[in-house]
Amino acid sequence: MYKTKCLREKLVLFLKIFFPILIYQFANYSASFVDTAMTGQYNTMDLAGVSMATSIWNPFFTFLTGIVSALVPIIGHHLGRGKKEEVASDFYQFIYLALGLSVVLLGMVLFLAPTILNHIGLEAAVAAVAVRYLWFLSIGIIPLLLFSVIRSLLDSLGLTKLSMYLMLLLLPLNSGFNYLLIYGAFGVPELGGAGAGLGTSLAYWVLLGISVLVLFKQEKLKALHLEKRILLNMDKIKEGVRLGLPIGGTVFAEVAVFSVVGLIMAKFSSLIIASHQSAMNFSSLMYAFPMSISSAMAIVVSYEVGAKRFDDAKTYIGLGRWTALIFAAFTLTFLYIFRGNVASLYGNDPKFIDLTARFLTYSLFFQLADTFAAPLQGILRGYKDTVIPFYLGLLGYWGVAIPVATLFDSLTDFGAYSYWIGLIISLIVSGALYRWRLTVIMKRFESLAKSKR
């Protein structure tokens, strides 16, 4: 990160940060995409099982990764104030925090997940696949969270290209392990859909090992003195939790409502479950665009706010939102034209392809709403405003999505589509609430700047 003097310099810096994050996010979401697509080609029953498992896994995992992502604005503010010597200490506190959170998530997966999956009316074969998938996936909890901390460090330092290169390793690793374990290639036991969970875990363990080597060999990081042993500092842990808990809670509120809808789909047929999850999976892949804008905004805004250059932060906000709209125009057009082709990536049954394509049509409205809402979340994190956005997200997602969806399901014959309509409306409401909050925060900082002149 560095100070910019004009709009052109800001645009160049923003794009330098954004594009590596975008590629990184695509690689990140590709793990779920590969699991779903390869399992779908194996058979629909296993796909339904993996779908149910990810509906339970995603909310809790994203909650914890949201907590450790608080490292980005913390380091951003240090750099903006010229306190680079504080970076290593905060990094190690978040490593300790990630290890503790890993134990929590592991316990939840091992003890709660089987109980939930066996009591929501799933077919026995589907529930069995889901439980085994989660058990295998839990092997990778520690490297998943530790890598999230390393990535947050690299991103906050503006080294997004380095984290991109690391994450690009995930796709071939995950695909290779999945091929071996799902289909039983080269004498490896055939595990079916559950093998996708083990494949992802093994891929992340390898990725973590490579990342640690890079961390201590990278010339640009040697000035941080990461090789020095830093003991646990509970004050910094508390600060990280104080800032990260609302971030994780906001992400959890959004992802959990999608997952609850996925679990509600258990009352429909295996075909509907598989089609719903396939469309939702591709929507998540497309979410990489607004999510990348959000992450880039958190980096640049936190840096400028830390340096008390509030007008510069405002300029970046405008650049980020326009970038989001431009990319949305391309992605929405692409998905509308090729929705049938996209559906065929997940299976070859004509009924499955037709139903998935219909769900993908609804996902166009998801992406439009996310284009507006997701960047706002990153901007607010850049201002270190996380508590109120958490409550706004809770209201927008849970106060709207399920009630509206249930109402549509009861009063119309839309069936499974009712729940997509509820989700779309909740995203629109949440975006409006975040926009209101940003207006309040920006006015507050503008008043603060004027009072100090």
Curated annotation (Swiss-Prot):
The chain crosses the membrane at residues 12-34, 54-76, 96-118, 128-150, 162-184, 194-216, 243-265, 285-307, 319-338, 358-380, 387-406, 416-438. CDD domains: MATE_NorM_like. Its main location: membrane. It is found in: Cell membrane. GO terms for molecular function: antiporter activity; xenobiotic transmembrane transporter activity. InterPro entries: MATE_fam, MATE_MdtK, MdtK-like. One of its GO terms (cellular component) is plasma membrane. GO terms for biological process: monoatomic ion transport. Keywords: Antiport, Cell membrane, Ion transport, Membrane, Transmembrane, Transmembrane helix, Transport. Multidrug efflux pump. Belongs to the multi antimicrobial extrusion (MATE) (TC 2.A.66.1) family. PANTHER family: FMN_FAD EXPORTER YEEO-RELATED, MULTIDRUG RESISTANCE PROTEIN NORM-RELATED. This is Probable multidrug resistance protein NorM.
